[in-house]
Amino acid sequence: WAPWCGPCKMIAPILNQIAEERDITIAKVNTDMNPLSMGKFGFRGIPALVLFHNGQAVDQMTGARPKPMFDQWLGKYMN
């Protein structure tokens, strides 16, 4: 995430809606202020999402997507 990133701004309301519907926490990390976070997970672009379960990264996704694709992605890991 970065404040200047158009696709990041575009998916923000989608992610907020998903967080409410699924009762999950979605945290944003500003890559301008935390540049090492990109390399830690091997990302080359934003928006980049990492799915954690019990403190471990279990999957990741890069790029803006429509809500059904995020729901499908999360559905692999939760009901």
Predicted regions and their residues:
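Pre-signature/interface helix of ABC/ABC-like ATPase nucleotide-binding domains
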Residues: 36-39, 59
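Short alpha-helical
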Residues: 6, 33-36, 68
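Non-catalytic, surface beta->alpha helical segment in thiol-disulfide oxidoreductase systems
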Residues: 44-79
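Pocket-edge positions in alpha/beta enzyme catalytic cores
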Residues: 3, 29, 61-62
